[in-house]
Amino acid sequence: MHTLEMLLLLLLLLPLALGEGDGQAVAGDRNPSEARSTHEHFLQRLIRLIHGSDCQPCGQYVCCPPWKYAEYRRFT
C-alpha cells in the first residue's frame, strides 16, 4: 500500500481505537459534537503535516496547494 492509503486507513480506524465506534455512551465521555470537532481538528493537523506549508483548506478534509485553491475558489 502507498503511504497515503495507509494514513487514510489509519484515520478510518482511529475512532474505533479511541472507543467511539461502538456507539455506547459511558459516563464521563465527551458529547458527540465535541468528539467530532476534535477528530476534524486532528485530521486538519495531519493534512497540514502531510502537505507542509503549502496547504490551503479548500473543502472538508481537503488540502490544496495555493494555485489550486485559487482555481477552486473561482468555481465555487
UniProtKB/Swiss-Prot annotation:
User: Which keywords does this Swiss-Prot/TrEMBL entry list?
Assistant: Cleavage on pair of basic residues, Disulfide bond, Secreted, Signal, Toxin
In terms of one coarse class, where is the protein primarily found?
secreted
From the UniProt record, list the residues forming the propeptide.
20-48, 73-76
Transmembrane residues, as ranges?
A: none
Tissue specificity, please?
Expressed by the venom duct.
Q: Which GO terms describe its molecular function?
A: toxin activity
- The disulfide bonds in this chain are 55-64, 58-63
In the record, which residues are listed under signal peptide? 1-19
Superkingdom, according to UniProt?
Eukaryota
Q: Name one GO cellular component term.
A: extracellular region
Per UniProt, subcellular location reads as: Secreted
Of which family is this protein a member? Belongs to the conotoxin Q superfamily.
Q: What is known of its domains?
A: The cysteine framework is XVI (C-C-CC).
Q: What is this protein called?
A: Conotoxin Fla16d
Annotated source species: Conus flavidus
